[in-house]
């Protein structure tokens, strides 16, 4: 059976919530994709934002590798971040405040590598600072997309990064 993976992410929330009605906003955050879509119906999607480099899940995985945590990186970075200080390491928030409808996480990943290489920061603090910077970027992009997409019935979050509790808390 041929199934479009991205369409599966866009429509599977309707299996969990039969009351979910079109149109709704979809924040898709995974290892391969980082997009905000207006889901208008089956087969009807309007992309409001997308990544221009690394997807968010990919950035989590690469951060885990930089910190020597292994794969899959998302849950490992999240666990390490719980014992860190998100304000301890100054990391960039790429495109924060920009009117461009894009995500960019490659520069954030590079900043994580520089922070590690400096030897001045604990891994826990780097993980927490990375996670917070990533969340700040997602929230900023999401707010901008929601302001321009028109009325929607709900915000749906899908993809592997949607399991991140800090991300879920920030989105609530």
Predicted features and spans:
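Short, active-site-adjacent cap segments at secondary-structure transitions
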Residues: 9, 35, 162-164
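N-terminal small/polar loop signature for handling phosphorylated ligands or for N-terminal nucleophile
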Residues: 1, 13, 143-146
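A short helix-loop
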Residues: 28-29, 35-121
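A contiguous, well-structured pocket-lining segment that forms one wall/lid of small-molecule binding clefts
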Residues: 78-156, 161-172
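Short beta-strand segments
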Residues: 3-4, 25-30, 37-38, 158
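Conserved phosphate-binding catalytic cores of ATP/NTP-utilizing and phosphoryl-transfer enzymes
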Residues: 3-25
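General beta-strand structural signal in soluble alpha/beta enzymes
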Residues: 1-5, 47, 73, 157
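A glycine- and small-aliphatic-rich helix-loop capping segment at beta-alpha/alpha-beta transitions
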Residues: 15-21, 40-46, 69, 169-172
